[in-house]
Amino acid sequence: MNPVRSSRVLVTLLVLGGCATNPVTGAREFVMLSEAQEIAMGREADVEVRRQMGLYEDDALQRYVEEIGLALASRSHRPELPWSFAIVDSPAINAFAVPGGFIYLTRGIMPFLSDEADLAGVLGHEVGHVTARHTVRAYTRASGAQLGLLVGSIFSPAASEVGGLVETGLGVLFLRYGRDAELQADRLGAEYAAISGWDPAGVRDMLSTLSRISEGSGGRGVPNWLSTHPDASDRVERVGSTLAELAARMDITGLRVNRQGYLDRLDGLIYGDDPDQGVVRGRDFLHTELRFALRFPDGWEVVNTETQVGATQPGEEVYMVLQLVTNPERRELEALAVDNMRRGGYRLDAGGETAINGL
């Protein structure tokens, strides 16, 4: 959370339910978004992800990831989407996708990938989530349950007008696709890598590496890859079967790995937290510049961005958002908070004020 930047609300989209054909399976399925709405929501979320998380400032590395991602997407089941690939400035070990073809890696995951084939495996996996419409189905499920995902727009004025819709923005960090979807994304990632010229074993290798990373090793402000992509160790064996199937269909020997080239690209990569935005250590959030610390309950997932810090309870039923806002009219804090909640369609049951180091 950067104290000099204030949060803006995020406009949500009104979506109507209907049936659509899955581009990968050809099956008819109920989803809340048409493809046009999916792309529009993705673009909206992309703006918020970039604003709240920020992109990692290395143009050459960004272009490198984008080139590989676009090569994979061009050979996927949905090449016509407006695909975008970017590295966000977070030390967490994660990768995630937004509906419509917007894919993100954190800078924190980059050192844990061994070579270019691993990178293609991660990107291909996330592309698979989009092509098989896992992202859309996850939004549909969350919308049906009226879950307010932890995002910058949790108090958005639009919420009362489009109540029951899933918020975009950083809510993508908490989307779970389920075991079957993860297995399908693994298979698609390996297939996309192979037909694009990369060794599909990179999917297996990156799963093997990430499965050895403990849950607590990479959170640091954003849920890590293992918490949103479960059963990695079991999936390693299943990817082996996928590789055998690919080998029966095409020659996958000698495909691109490029270990040294990948490692050269990482030279100078920043590792760790940015103390100016505060740091997350376990369940503690610490901000040296503002001189305060906050301890969350056990099991809560914490998100720290340039504009806010928030946490969600296991089960996603209770949320907390700590946010710095401008108050040029010097209104009473409780009135300011209640007004924001009311505009968002929320009712205050109980509230009060507290001060921490003069804040």
Predicted regions and their residues:
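A Zn2+-metalloprotease active-site environment signal
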Residues: R8, C19-P297, E301-E317, Q323-L359
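Bacterial N-terminal signal peptides that target proteins for export
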Residues: M1-L10
